[in-house]
Amino acid sequence: MQPLRLNSQGIQTQVIELIKPVTARRPPACKAFPACGSCHYQHWQETEVSVWKQTQVKAFLKRANVWPVQMRPLRTVPLNNRRRATFHLKRFADGIVAGFNEREGQQIVTPESCVVLHPDLSALLEKLRNFAAREFPIGSSVDAQVNGLDQGLCV
């Protein structure tokens, strides 16, 4: 590894030589990974993500002096099932940019499709894009928080 620069998560590095791949890694399902900031852990096996999340929760509870006697393993969300997202839309003179903020930045990444989102949320992004193209003045932008509830979408 070669250090490149400091960022909010530590030191950004570049791989110089891969000696042995880590078994916890998998190819990311999304073509926009890692530029898209929506899915940070797609390159991990689901069991590894679950263990990491559980470690984080236990550490938080310990700092709060609340230590569970027993804790069930945390579940991860399978592909096409995420029911919460923040969509970013911006109107330019030549059209709309709609999608997710890039990782570590403010540029909007517009993936062709999102393999993580529930199909209802993916369909809503296209509807929001069409709405913004008709209704937004040039230069305006909006962040749309969306939650998929059992009764429908809450925007």
Region annotations inferred by a language model:
Residues 1-155:
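Accessory RNA-recognition modules of RNA-modification enzymes
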